[in-house]
Amino acid sequence: MRLNDVKPQKGSKKRRRRVGRGISAGQGASAGLGMRGQKSRSGSGTRPGFEGGQQPLYRRIPKLKGFPVVNRKIYTTINVEKLADLPANTEVTLESLRAAGILTAAKGPLKILGNGDLGVALNVKAAAFTGQARSKIEAAGGSCEVLG
């Protein structure tokens, strides 16, 4: 076998069909574009989103106000009522809550929310507290420490 014997695989070099070159050529007259209408004209087709003259969807729906916050901080949140099961004077952190099985997945820094009641004094260390959560923890005799 020599280099001049190498030929492409049979059927791999299919010639493109030349359309619109007379009726006897097979694809003459309308060149596979059907009868009349917008899709058979030159420069054919409609723009994306065109719905045949009906008001398109992107113009029917309202423009929404505002914009998304780019670097939004995602917190792992927990309510004060979940902390009520812990023993008194426990130091509460994200790691200790995961070890205790109260939290299963941590998406980010810990934030304490104020839903429910707390009757136990706890030393809570978290990235953020709501006002209600802070007042309930301190009313129970505990302390709140914001981690930076």
UniProtKB/Swiss-Prot annotation:
It comes from the Bacteria. One of its GO terms (cellular component) is cytosolic large ribosomal subunit. One of its GO terms (biological process) is translation. GO terms for molecular function: rRNA binding; structural constituent of ribosome. Residues 1-57 are annotated as: Disordered. Residues 10-20 have a biased composition (Basic residues). Residues 23-35 have a biased composition (Gly residues). The keyword Glycosyltransferase does not apply. The keyword Ligase does not apply. Keywords: Ribonucleoprotein, Ribosomal protein, RNA-binding, rRNA-binding. Part of the 50S ribosomal subunit. Belongs to the universal ribosomal protein uL15 family. NCBIfam families: rplO_bact (TIGR01071). PANTHER family: 50S RIBOSOMAL PROTEIN L15 (PTHR12934), LARGE RIBOSOMAL SUBUNIT PROTEIN UL15M (PTHR12934:SF11). Binds to the 23S rRNA. This is Large ribosomal subunit protein uL15. It comes from Nostoc sp. (strain PCC 7120 / SAG 25.82 / UTEX 2576).
